[in-house]
């Protein structure tokens, strides 16, 4: 997955991205890795591309300008972005949370765990000792803390907890 960095970083400069995105191998790879729809993978991919090249957050309005999107296309992709936000893959930038930008031209940033997994190739579950009950409980507690701290949505908490449980070998005895 770490090779995604170079593949994603150039998407921002592809003026035909939205026309060709459904057949883009990088978009399909992200769709498969995160188990999301092709449209969600497309929007997430372009937000990551902007985030890699420029700043911590991506002004969604810049997509409209850079890709010359018509209003109905822009609203379609914006709706998908809000679905990604609800699922916890992206978050509204802090300025938006304080009410400094509108719902029609928000700024988003990619969740740190998603960014680390896709770009850096780091999955926090690789550091968990699944034979140690305390290690498993600790990672679940950290997820709950992130949810309480509004850094993780309920949807993502459940999906991340399920990832932990899926990696847990029920037959294995804890030490």
Give a label for each model feature.
Residues 1-175:
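Intrinsically disordered, low-complexity N-terminal extensions of AAA+/P-loop NTPases
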């Amino acid at each position: 997955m770490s090779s995604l960095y170079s593949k994603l970083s150039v998407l921002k400069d592809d003026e035909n991205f939205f026309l060709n995105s459904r057949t883009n191998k990088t978009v399909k790879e992200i769709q498969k890795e995160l188990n999301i729809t092709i449209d969600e993978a497309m929007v997430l991919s372009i937000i990551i591309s902007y985030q890699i090249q420029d700043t911590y957050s991506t002004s969604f309005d810049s997509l409209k300008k850079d890709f010359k999107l018509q209003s109905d296309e822009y609203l379609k992709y914006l709706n998908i972005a809000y679905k990604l936000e609800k699922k916890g893959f992206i978050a509204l930038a802090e300025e938006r949370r304080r009410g400094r930008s509108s719902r029609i031209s928000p700024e988003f940033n990619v969740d740190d765990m998603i960014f680390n997994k896709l770009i850096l190739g780091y999955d926090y579950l690789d550091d968990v000792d699944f034979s140690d009950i305390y290690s498993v409980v600790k990672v679940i507690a950290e997820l709950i803390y992130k949810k309480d701290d509004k850094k993780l949505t309920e949807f993502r908490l459940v999906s991340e907890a399920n990832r932990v449980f899926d990696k847990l070998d029920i037959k294995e005895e804890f030490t």
